[in-house]
Amino acid sequence: MKAFDDINAELENDWTWRFAELVRLENIYKFVEENSKIVVRKAQILLLYSHFEGYTKFAFLYYIIAINESNTKIKNLTSMLKAAAMHNVFREYKNLNKTGKYFPKGLPNETELKECSRRLEFVERFHLFLDDIASIPDEISDTQSNLKPEVLYKILFQL
């Protein structure tokens, strides 16, 4: 796994250039004519939000990359990170159109039976998934181009 100092340095580097842009715009504001200050202030607000979202997205993505590069088995992660690492497995098992062990030649028409067979297959293979190397998909940190509180909460909950 990446060393704490390396992770901290990457986060600090990203924050530094973003903060420098905000300071530059604040310095420009001081020299703008009074009748144009509102335009610069609006630009500052937009840039501030943009950097807030960008930094948040970068930090979460960097966290995911650090976990993925650590080559840690899923069984050694916290429960929440186990769920995140198994994101694609869960998606696969939600697919009721996929044939499986119990209905290899075709699926029954009954949805409840399809769900039951998919769940049973998952339970039978669960212990095998735990020995896989964790690979959390980037989409877990998707800010949906709008970092409203619900989106931030969702990402924090998943990681």
Spans of features found by a protein language model:
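Charged alpha-helical initiation segments
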Residues: M1-L46, L61-Y63, E69-S70, I74-A84
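Helix-loop junctions and short alpha-helical segments
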Residues: L48, F60-L159
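Extended alpha-helical coiled-coil scaffold domains characteristic of the BAR superfamily
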Residues: S50-G54
